[in-house]
Each structure stands twice: as structure tokens, then as C-alpha cells.
């Protein structure tokens, strides 16, 4: 179900009209009906939802998801840590029956027909105005469905807004890199000096081992290790 911290976060997002994408996790375990989960999301988070992927069974019989946004079938293999097979397949084709079985294919077609009848057609502008939240299904433990959500996010998310600096506004279209650290997590492993700095990119492109000016300290710094979503 919806956790307490999620409700608090959504309250802030509604106040600021910040668009969100929802990931329904643990589809490789037995759980509630997807439609029941979507109803709970709309009631608890007070936002309209629109599925952009749909699970094919769940628990031990979980076969994967149909990526509605990309019109592709993403097949699931436990412990592979990735989508093991991505197939562009027509929802009414015999190929779908061969891939997931006739019973699962029939249920998927029935569910998608209900999805199209109940939920509004997805529009990017409606999402960017925080009026609807796209929903993806998957298994975070197996890293299944996560990359597909990130790919969609990169494509539909709004561009950064201009950010005020000390002397001027930073335009996100500028080629030169600018950014600010909004969070630092320390002591994440036994090494007492270890930390992760979370940086919002305001313009340009961040590259490793390049000198960057720390404005407050007036020092030039280099960073050899970065992590980002591909």
C-alpha cells in the first residue's frame, strides 16, 4: 500500500505542482490486483493516474510487463538484474500468446482494454502540469522495469527552470556546466571519509576529471567518480 512518507511527499508535490512518476514495486511477489492498487493511489495521493506499463501476472507466475508507452513486451527472468528480452509485438498477435501463454495473453488484452476505457489518454503536457501521474510496474530488487521508467522520465520530464545565481540567472540552455549540491550523504561505508554529494545540473554537461569552480570556497575541484541514470 501507500506508505506514510509517500503521502507526505505527495502533499509537497501538490503544493508545488511538481509532476511525479509512480513505480509499483514487487510484482514478482504475490500481491493485490493492479486495479485495486491504482484506485488506492488516486484516493490516498489525490492525483489522477495513467498506467504506462502493465504487469503480466504476478508472484511466481510473473512473466513481465507490457510497456504501453513503447508498445513493447518486456519479459522477466528472476535474478538477471535487467530486462532479459524486449519484444516489439502487437497486442493482438499470436506472437504474444507464444511469449507469455494463451491465458496470460488473454488476461493482458482484457486488462489493457479496461485501462484504455477507464484512464485518460496520456498527454505529456498534462503530466508536466502535475495533473496526472504515469504509473510503471516492476521489481526493483531485480532491477526490472526501473530503466524503462527512467527512459520515459528523460523523454517526458520538463526542462530545468532558470536558477538564480549570485549575479545572474543561469539558463538551462547554456553550454557551460553549472550546478549546485543540494544533499550530502556521509559515512555510507566503513571508510569514515566516504560520502555522496547529490548535484542538480542547472546547465551544460557534467564530466569526470574536469576542473570545476566551487563558488563559495573559490577553489577548483575535480571529481573522478560519478553516478547517473542512463
Residue ranges and their predicted role:
Residues 1-230:
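Structural and coupling elements of P-loop NTPases
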Amino acid at each position: 500500500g501507500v506508505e506514510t512518507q509517500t503521502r507526505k511527499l505527495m502533499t509537497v508535490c501538490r503544493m508545488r505542482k511538481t509532476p511525479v512518476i509512480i513505480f509499483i514495486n514487487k510484482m514478482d511477489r504475490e500481491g493485490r490486483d493492479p486495479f485495486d492498487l491504482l484506485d488506492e493511489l488516486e484516493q490516498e495521493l489525490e492525483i489522477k493516474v495513467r498506467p504506462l506499463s502493465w504487469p503480466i501476472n504476478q508472484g511466481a507466475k510473473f512473466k513481465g510487463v507490457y510497456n504501453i508507452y513503447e508498445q513493447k513486451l518486456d519479459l522477466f527472468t528472476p535474478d538477471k538484474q535487467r530486462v532479459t528480452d524486449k519484444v516489439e509485438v502487437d497486442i493482438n498477435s499470436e506472437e504474444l500468446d507464444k511469449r507469455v501463454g494463451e491465458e496470460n495473453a488473454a488476461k493482458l488484452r482484457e486488462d489493457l482494454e479496461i485501462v484504455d476505457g477507464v484512464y485518460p489518454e496520456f498527454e505529456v503536457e498534462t503530466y508536466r502540469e502535475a495533473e496526472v501521474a504515469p504509473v510503471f510496474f516492476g521489481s526493483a530488487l531485480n532491477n526490472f522495469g526501473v530503466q524503462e521508467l527512467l527512459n520515459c522520465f528523460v523523454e517526458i520530464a520538463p526542462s530545468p527552470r532558470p536558477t538564480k545565481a549570485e549575479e545572474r540567472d543561469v539558463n538551462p540552455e547554456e553550454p557551460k556546466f553549472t550546478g549546485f549540491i543540494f544533499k550530502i550523504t556521509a559515512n555510507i561505508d566503513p571508510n569514515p571519509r566516504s560520502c555522496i554529494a547529490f548535484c542538480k545540473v542547472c546547465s551544460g554537461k557534467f564530466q569526470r576529471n574536469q576542473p570545476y569552480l566551487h563558488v563559495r570556497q573559490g577553489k577548483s575541484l575535480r571529481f573522478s567518480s560519478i553516478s547517473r541514470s542512463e
